[in-house]
């Protein structure tokens, strides 16, 4: 039976969002009378404020620079519908199913903070979309990250009123048709509900949750690959000695060194004379590269999770003090900072693995391993092993590195210069995912190469099998899915299979 995540009953974590995205947990909305009163009190206060004095942005006025347009009361109900319609201009690929679930979960949780002036009924229908896996088709391109993710989130807002297409049971269908089939009633917006859904950071925040989770595993896997290559290269295990890292006590640096050290079985390694007293930087300094993620992870998590558990639309409706605040909480600067930082660290890990890959296939540096790790028992001149794969690794790494320019510096004035400073957080998050995709490809290739190198050393009796004691699970997992490379063959499918296993966090780290 699946664990249940209850929205409205405490704070969500990155792990909660990822679990919802992957359908590893069930989702419920807090149904207590107290929570329902908390949410509905915001919508009721907004109605009262509207009746008393009017003049509420996005309710009685146009949007953005058009806020000087004051609407007659008979147009109030049509305004939010128009908002969803004219923002239906996104382009690019649609977000995948996992990311779409994450977007809905994040927006649901931010609206559940009780400062958005929405009804409990709105939260309920978004929950029903999640529970029934009704997934709005949300284009990835078109958000500048302030006012939030207006265009992407318009596809969620439009879907709950029956005006957008969704994916349901693998088919593209009208949301109205799917809701009728399931006995659901399309939502009827109250005054601020469309802008409450749209004017926030849920798309970039959801992508950030997915990116953080992938980067965390990739960092762990990079430590494991480094340990495998250190053994295969007959490297100096004492580059990762605990006492050494007490002299420079960055916690993440020490943690990375420990993860590498734990793979090396130092009880055996201490009796092995390394080929050189000092290995190249791509081995010796690996903890200093990978450890940057561990040292920054708490800060990145804080940025992502505070945003996740905040009200981030405009205006903020506070029924508790009976105030309506016009501000800029839709600005995605914190997520942009997190993603600009994370993509830089991930790309550096790819660059590290690229250097390790280049070293282990090159007979000038790989300490008597065969050229390109060709595993044939006879002549090496026909077989070229991982030669082309290493070229691919260079290409993937270069592509990842060129995406590390921070997106925040590309802010553009837009929307009649009302949105004259914007975050670009959504593009930063999407860039981070692309950097992760490329870096995972680098890791897949390097993992296979490191396992091949270890196998060759073992077959030649050049290393003791006990050296692999702490790496055996990962080593066995590789060869359970990957036939050793003895003669040249196409490796594309092997790489794709390994990539999917990495993304499912299959390998022991």
Please identify what each model-predicted range represents.
Residues 73-88, 359-372:
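Catalytic or ion-translocation cores adjacent to nucleophile or general acid/base/metal-coordination motifs
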Residues 2-34, 38, 42-45, 50, ...:
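C-terminal auxiliary extensions adjacent to catalytic cores
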Residues 63, 89-90, 109-110, 130, ...:
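Acidic, glycine-rich active-site loops and adjacent beta-strand->loop/helix elements
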Residues 138-143, 320-324:
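Cysteine-centered functional microenvironments
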Residues 86, 106-110, 125-136, 141, ...:
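Mid-sequence acidic-hydrophobic segments that form the walls
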Residues 57-79, 86-111, 139-161, 176, ...:
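FAD-binding core of FAD-dependent oxidoreductases
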């Amino acid at each position: 039976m699946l664990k249940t995540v209850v929205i409205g009953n405490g704070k969500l974590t990155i792990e909660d969002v990822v679990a919802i995205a992957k359908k590893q947990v069930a989702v419920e909305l807090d149904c207590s009378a107290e929570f329902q009163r908390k949410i509905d009190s915001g919508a009721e206060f907004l109605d009262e404020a509207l009746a008393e004095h009017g003049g509420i942005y996005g309710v009685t006025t146009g949007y953005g620079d058009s806020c000087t347009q004051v609407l007659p009361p008979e147009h109030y109900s049509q305004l939010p519908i128009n908002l969803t319609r004219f923002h239906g201009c996104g382009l690019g690929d649609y977000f995948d199913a996992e990311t779409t679930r994450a977007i809905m979960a994040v927006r649901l949780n931010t609206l559940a903070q009780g400062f958005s002036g929405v009804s409990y009924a709105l939260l309920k229908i978004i929950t029903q979309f999640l529970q029934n896996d009704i997934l709005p088709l949300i284009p990835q391109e078109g958000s500048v990250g302030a006012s939030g993710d207006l265009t992407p989130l318009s596809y969620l807002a439009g879907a709950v009123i029956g005006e957008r297409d969704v994916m349901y049971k693998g088919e593209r269908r009208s949301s109205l048709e799917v809701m009728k089939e399931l006995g659901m009633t399309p939502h009827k917006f109250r005054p601020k509900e469309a802008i409450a859904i749209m004017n926030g950071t849920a798309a970039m925040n959801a992508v950030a949750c997915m990116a953080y989770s992938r980067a965390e595993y990739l960092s762990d896997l990079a430590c494991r690959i480094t340990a495998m290559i250190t053994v295969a290269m007959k490297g100096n295990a004492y580059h990762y000695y605990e006492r050494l890292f007490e002299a420079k006590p960055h916690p993440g640096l020490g943690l990375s060194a420990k993860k590498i050290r734990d793979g090396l079985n130092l009880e055996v390694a201490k009796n092995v004379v390394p080929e050189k007293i000092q290995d190249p930087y791509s081995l010796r300094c690996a903890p200093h590269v990978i450890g940057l993620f561990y040292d920054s992870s708490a800060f990145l998590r804080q940025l992502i999770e505070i945003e996740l558990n905040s009200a981030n639309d405009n205006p903020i409706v506070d029924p508790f003090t009976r105030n309506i605040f016009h501000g800029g909480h839709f600005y995605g600067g914190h997520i942009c900072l997190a993603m600009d930082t994370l993509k830089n660290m991930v790309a550096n890990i790819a660059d590290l693995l690229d250097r390790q890959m280049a070293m282990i296939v090159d007979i000038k540096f790989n300490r008597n391993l065969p050229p390109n790790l060709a595993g044939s028992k006879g002549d090496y001149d026909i077989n070229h092993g991982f030669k082309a794969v290493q070229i691919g690794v260079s290409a993937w790494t270069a592509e990842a590195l060129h995406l590390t320019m921070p997106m925040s510096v590309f802010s553009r004035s837009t929307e009649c210069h009302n949105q004259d400073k914007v975050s670009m957080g959504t593009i930063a998050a999407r860039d981070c995912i692309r950097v992760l995709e490329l870096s995972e490809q680098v890791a897949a290739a390097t993992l296979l190469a490191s396992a091949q190198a270890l196998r060759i050393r073992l077959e030649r009796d050049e290393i003791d099998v006990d050296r692999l004691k702490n790496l055996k699970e990962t080593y066995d997992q590789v060869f359970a899915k990957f036939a050793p490379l003895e003669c040249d063959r196409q490796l594309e499918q092997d790489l794709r299979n390994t990539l999917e296993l990495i993304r499912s966090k299959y390998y022991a780290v």
